[in-house]
Amino acid sequence: MTAAGHDEEFPYEKRLEGLLEELRGHSRIQVDETRLGPIEMPFDNFGEVFKDLVKWYDLPFGEPIREKFFRYAEVEASWRSADPQSELVGEFSLSHVFRSVVENHVSDTWEGKDDEERELYGELRIFDDTPRTGSGRMAALRATRGTTDPEIWFFDMRQGALEMDLDYPAYLDTLLLTKGTIGWQYLFCDAGFGDVGFTPLAKGLQEMVEVIPRLFPQYDYAELASRLRERM
C-alpha cells in the first residue's frame, strides 16, 4: 500500500502517527516513550475485524467507530512537561479494537463489590490504559451484545467506574487534543473538585488547559477549558 493509500484508507491511524510526532518534536515536552505496536494478521484486515466482531461477539459497531480503525496492536506514549516545576504529565496506551474486545476485560482484574458492578465490569473492555505510570486509570467500552455505539466508561481504582459523556469516536478525537494528559477523562464524567479521583489531578488539568493551547495553538481547547471550570 502506498503512503497516500494508507492515509486515505486509515485516516485515524495517520492522525495517531502525527500525535506521536507532535510529542517527539516539541522542545517543551520530555518524552519518555512513544511506540507504534506491530501490525499483525488478522488485525490488519479492516473487513474481517468488524465481521468477526459481529460473528463471534455480536458487536455490530457502526460506521463512526469503523472510521476510527487503526491497524497497530497498540499505540503508546508517555511524556511530561520539560519544566521541572510543572505537574503536566501524560500517558496513553490505545489497543486495537479487536484486541480490546477479546483480551482486555476489566473483570480479569476487578471483580466488583455487588451484582450490578460485577455485571458492568463483566462487559467492560479496556481500550486505553496507563501501564507505564501504573496510575490505575483506564478507559473501556461496554461490550453489550447488539450495540452499535457502546457506552464509554472511565475506571479509576480510587473512584471506581464512571460513565463518560462521549462515545468511542469522540474519545479518540479528544485524546488527540489532550495528548493523553493524565485524568483528562474526568472532564467528561460526573465528577469534580472534592472527589477522591478528580481532586489530586486538578492542578495538572488546570495546567493542561492553560499550557497545551500555547504549545499546540492549531487546536481548539475551549470546550475542555469550559468543562474544567464547571468542575472546579
Model-derived segments and spans:
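Broad, structure-driven detector of short, well-ordered beta-strand segments within folded domains
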Residues: 134-145
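A surface-exposed partner-binding patch
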Residues: 1-134, 230-232
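Charge-dense, low-complexity intrinsically disordered regions
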Residues: 185, 191-232
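Aromatic/basic-lined ligand-recognition segments
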Residues: 130-136, 212, 216
